[in-house]
Structures are given as C-alpha cells and as structure tokens.
Amino acid sequence: MRRLVTAAAIVGLVTSGAQARSLTERNRAVVQDFARIFYAERDVEQAFRKYVVPDYIQHNPGIADGRQAAIDALKPMFSRPGAQFDVKRIIVDGDLAVIHLFGRGDPSTPGAAVADIYRLKDGKIVEHWDILQPMPTQSANPHPMF
C-alpha cells in the first residue's frame, strides 16, 4: 500500500511539473509574439487587441485600467519618430512574464532600463506592472545597464 501511495505521489508531481512547463511554454510564445508586435514593430493597437483582455489591470499610476486606456496612453509614445524600444530579455515562468528592455519614448532623453511585468490567464495578458530606471550619465561601477 505504501508503494502505491508513493507511486501515485510521484505521478502527480511529474504531471504537475509537465503541466507547469507546458503553461510556461505556451505563455512564452504569447509574450514573444506580443513583444515583437509591441516593441519591435511598435504596433500598439495590434499587440493589445490581439493579446490583452479588455478589462486589463494596470498598476502604473499614470495609466488607467483597461486595454483601451493603455492603447491611448502608449500609442503616441510608440509612434513618435526616433522612439526606441530594444528588448534585451524575456523571462516567463507559469503565468508571469518579464520583458526587460531599453526604452526611449522621447529621442531627446537618455532613455531608461524598463522591466514590464505581465500576468497571463488563458493565453491573454490580464495585468501589468512596470519598473523604470533612468539611464545614468555616470555610474559608480563599470557594469553596463544591459
């Protein structure tokens, strides 16, 4: 009986691990395509209509909740001539994703290191947080930002 319980527990762990990997891989594909459309092609409208739910939760205090509010806030910055958004890495684990990038919405500024954090549900982005660190003119260490 003890062996049967142990075997069942092992099968459960293996299945659970495979499901988590499967979720991560599905979400990685979504986030990679979202990043391509949003940051590389700078097509805010298409990226958000394809991958973001209408009642999107926004934690950036400068942007209201909702997909349309995000489109309205981001589209002018992403369509500005000389704006630059260079994705450095994408990290996905289960339902969470981080896109780490260099962003410069206004070409007259030095830009910032940005970490956009997304939560996904059923293959769609449902929630967003962001962290911005302005690019310094001087650094206390020799390490680059990226």
Specify the residue positions occupied by each region the protein language model found.
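C-terminal segment of classical bacterial N-terminal signal peptides
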Residues: 13-19
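C-terminal and inter-domain tail/linker signature
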Residues: 19-146
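Bacterial N-terminal signal peptides that target proteins for export
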Residues: 1-5
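Bacterial N-terminal signal peptides
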Residues: 7-12
